[in-house]
Regions:
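Single conserved hydrophobic/aromatic residue that forms the stacking wall/gate
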Residues: 157-161
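Conserved ABC ATPase "signature" region
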Residues: 99, 110-128
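The feature captures the beta-strand-to-loop junction immediately N-terminal to the Walker
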Residues: 40-42
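Conserved ABC ATPase signature
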Residues: 132-136, 140
Length: 161
């Protein structure tokens, strides 16, 4: 089971003027393994706040969010994110970037190299493993970030726009 569950999730911020802003109000959802969720809405509706809570960067005002029945209370290696700006380690190669999360999980080096090669092929970057990431186009960097993110999470196949 790998469900992401939000129950009565609330996030309230105070503005510099002391006004109360409800970024999230009683948000409930269950996302099962293999499902994708798209969050759409106008600026300021809570999309980034939800991602920050899901990543464990901030704690909700009330309610809970759990992954595999464990409350998310901080960043963890069981989740991966791809930011609008890929957040790659520019001094590392493509393969080293993808391998980063796998090394954090202390996987066998032969197994990790095989996984890195598989993910680079899936995202269309086969043969780019030894390329420094700063030499790639923006779109290619996003694909490296996607491969790095999903290589060590529970996801099995990426979706690219």
């Amino acid at each position: 089971m790998s469900d992401l569950v939000s129950q009565n999730l609330n996030m309230i911020f105070k503005t510099p003027k002391g006004e109360t802003v409800h970024a999230l109000k009683d948000l409930n959802f269950t996302l099962k393994k293999g499902e994708l969720l798209t969050v759409l809405g106008p600026s300021g509706c809570g999309k980034t706040t939800l991602l920050n809570i899901t990543a464990g960067f901030i704690r909700p005002t009330s309610g809970s969010i759990t992954l595999n029945s464990k409350e998310i209370d901080g960043p963890g290696v069981e989740r991966g994110m791809v930011f609008q700006q890929g957040a790659l380690f520019e001094w590392l190669t493509v393969a080293e970037n993808v391998n980063f999360g796998l090394r954090m999980k202390k996987k066998d080096p032969f197994e990790t190299q095989k996984k890195v090669d598989e993910w680079l092929e899936i995202v269309g970057l086969k043969g780019f493993g030894n390329t420094p990431t700063y030499q790639l186009s923006g779109g290619m960097q996003q694909r490296v970030a996607l491969a790095r993110s999903v290589s060590y999470t529970h996801l099995t196949l990426p979706t690219k726009a």
